[in-house]
From Swiss-Prot:
InterPro entries (alphabetical): PLD-like_dom, PLD_domain, PLipase_D/transphosphatidylase
Pfam families (UniProt xref): PLDc_2
Keyword Transmembrane (UniProt): yes
Subunit structure: Homodimer.
Transmembrane segments: 6-24
Protein name, as recorded: Mitochondrial cardiolipin hydrolase
Keyword line: Differentiation, Endonuclease, Hydrolase, Lipid degradation, Lipid metabolism, Meiosis, Membrane, Metal-binding, Mitochondrion, Mitochondrion outer membrane, Nuclease, Spermatogenesis, Transmembrane, Transmembrane helix
Residues on Mitochondrial intermembrane side: 1-5
Amino acid sequence: MLLWGRWKLAAGLAGLALSLELFYRYMRRRKPLREVLFFPVPVTCIEPVLSPMKQCSCPLPHTDSAFSRLLVQLLGAQRSLELCVFTFSSPSLARALLILHRRDVRVRVITDNDYMAAPGSQIGPLRSAGVAVRHDQSSGYMHHKFAVVDGTVVLTGSLNWTVQAFQSNKENILITDDTVIVKAYQKEFERLWEEYDPATYNFFPEKENK
């Protein structure tokens, strides 16, 4: 019986070692994620990305685009999505965040206080749906434009999340899973998330200075 137990233990350890070796081989073979998206892009149908189970017969072109690839990256989130963006008025991107929120993916948004109430802003609807949103409380702009997916992928560049940015402006987004870069952006998000905690807001700064 003792010999049988030792044999089972040895077999288990051998299996674990083999699994780890296969995992490490896979990681070595896996190509790093390095993609750059450029805008503007033509208007195309994004329903196959947002609602893959539904058939769409709209007249828009059903082709791949930088915008659809951006949506694919965001909707690939399994655990978390951290978004830091200056202005957010794209209904399609708001819809993507709500899809993630309903999947119980933790979605957190940081934005600029001067622009979050602008006409067409999606911040109000996101908050109403239960998405966690925080904003700055300073005279300077919260001008970041980046997202961190599952703590493993970062999307960053010049792009604001507006229809004009996607369809009219010359913009770019870099997508990478470089560990050093992702950690830096994750750290910056967490720093701002704590800094913009509503519990620490000073709503009467003029009284404090007297």
